[in-house]
UniProtKB/Swiss-Prot annotation:
Alphabetically ordered keywords of this record: Acetylation, Cytoplasm, Protease inhibitor, Serine protease inhibitor
Positions where N-acetylmethionine occurs in the chain: 1
Cytoplasm listed as a keyword: yes
PROSITE patterns the record matches: SERPIN (PS00284)
Pfam family, one: Serpin
Transmembrane segments: none
Descriptive protein name: Leukocyte elastase inhibitor
Organism (species): Xenopus laevis (African clawed frog)
PANTHER family named in the record: LEUKOCYTE ELASTASE INHIBITOR, SERINE PROTEASE INHIBITOR, SERPIN
Listed InterPro entries: Serpin_CS (IPR023795), Serpin_dom (IPR023796), Serpin_fam (IPR000215), Serpin_sf (IPR036186), Serpin_sf_1 (IPR042178), Serpin_sf_2 (IPR042185)
């Protein structure tokens, strides 16, 4: 399963860099695990060149027993006996009721991804179909994503809508005291600032300083330490935008492992803004630009493992996400453990009053559930 987590992390940073081409300074938030899972369900039904392109783009070529690994990963993430946090990754296919999907494909998707096929009438009851899909996503994300499909995103030629939703709500292992939250300035760049509600606590937490890129890394565990938020904060804004440019160029699976492996429990003065991010992406152009060209092309998509007809292709990949960070913890949605005993003696400052990157990690599987950039209130 480690290979699968690595593949999903590689894809996470590839996609981040692609999205960054058209949005290099704004807030950003998405769920790589949710997207990888959704696209793996499609991959199950692809053949030929379409499958090759997907495998390469998603780094699936390095993973043995891909779909059974996803089955194990999803079971680990969706553990039902957890009472300290809510985490739910859900998948579903919605198919045009007159269209024939191969029974083999449907049974594989059900077995490996716990996803069934909802049949809807795109041809004569388009609006009802759209509402039904939105209702399912809203239920899976506890109402945080009420409308994954806006008007006009599906039409009467739609045959298949692939929906994937992930929801997370967790409390910090060490909560912030709301009485210590105050209005403070947040520096957007060298010239502009805005006021934020800044939380504060002093706590012993895993911390690391990376001198090569002048960055501080802090781990904020959630209750039970099964999940953590990891925040990567440059010392200063040293470029003409967010101060994150050098760090973002360096991002890779290897670097994240290197930076987070040597974290030491350290007394840290933490200033972290309360924030809420909501994002919506249409990812067809980014994924095609990363190499998945044929999947979205009606003339060349090979989804013959999904349907006997040769005119099926994917028209769009829509991803919506939501995260809220406050004194109690984090609530996040997207449609789509122990601490070492060595200890640093000195106290460190971790003052997130300027743009930073953050990720929410499932510690046992080292899977990045969510990845984001906070650059503006």
């Amino acid at each position: 399963m480690e290979n699968l987590s690595s593949a999903c992390t590689h894809f996470c940073f590839d996609l981040f860099k692609k999205i960054n081409e058209n949005n290099s300074t704004g807030n950003l938030f998405f769920s790589p695990i949710s997207l990888s899972t959704a696209l793996a369900m499609v991959f199950l039904g692809t053949k030929g060149k379409t499958a090759e392109q997907m495998s390469k783009t998603l780094h699936f070529d390095a993973v043995k027993d891909l779909h059974s690994n996803f089955q194990t990963l999803n079971a680990e993430i969706n553990k039902k006996d957890v009472s300290t946090y809510a985490l739910n990754l859900a998948n579903r296919l919605f198919g045009e009721k007159t269209f024939n999907f191969l029974p083999n494909f449907l049974s594989s998707v059900k077995k490996q991804y716990s996803a069934d096929l909802g049949t809807v009438d795109f041809i004569s009851a388009l609006e009802d179909a759209r509402k039904e899909i939105n209702k399912w996503v809203s239920e899976q994300t506890k109402g945080k994503i009420p409308e994954v499909l806006s008007t006009g995103t599906v039409d009467r030629s739609t045959k298949l809508v692939l929906v994937n939703a992930i929801y997370f709500k967790g409390d910090w292992a060490k909560k912030f005291n709301a009485e210590h939250t105050t209005d403070m300035p947040f520096q957007l760049n060298k010239k502009e600032q805005k006021t934020v509600k800044m939380m504060y606590q002093k706590e012993k937490l895993p911390f690391n300083y990376i001198p090569d890129i002048n960055c501080r890394i802090l781990e904020l565990p959630y209750v039970d330490y099964e999940l953590s938020m990891i925040i990567i904060l440059p010392d200063n804004i040293n470029d003409d935008t967010t101060g994150l440019q050098q760090l973002e160029k360096e991002l890779s699976l290897e670097k994240i492992h290197e930076w987070t492996e040597n974290m030491m429990p350290t007394d840290v003065h933490i200033h972290l803004p309360k924030f809420k991010l909501e994002d919506s992406y249409k990812l067809k152009s980014q994924l095609a630009g990363m190499g998945m060209v044929d999947l979205f092309n009606s003339g060349s998509a090979d989804l013959s493992g999904m349907s006997g007809s040769n005119n099926l292709f994917l028209s769009e990949v829509i991803h919506k996400s939501f995260v809220e960070v406050n004194e109690e913890g984090t609530e996040a949605a997207a449609a789509s453990a122990g601490i070492a005993m060595m200890c640093m003696m000195r106290e460190e400052e971790f003052n997130a009053d300027h743009p930073f990157l953050f990720l929410i990690r499932h510690n046992a599987t080292k899977s990045i559930l969510f990845f984001g950039r906070y650059s503006s209130p």
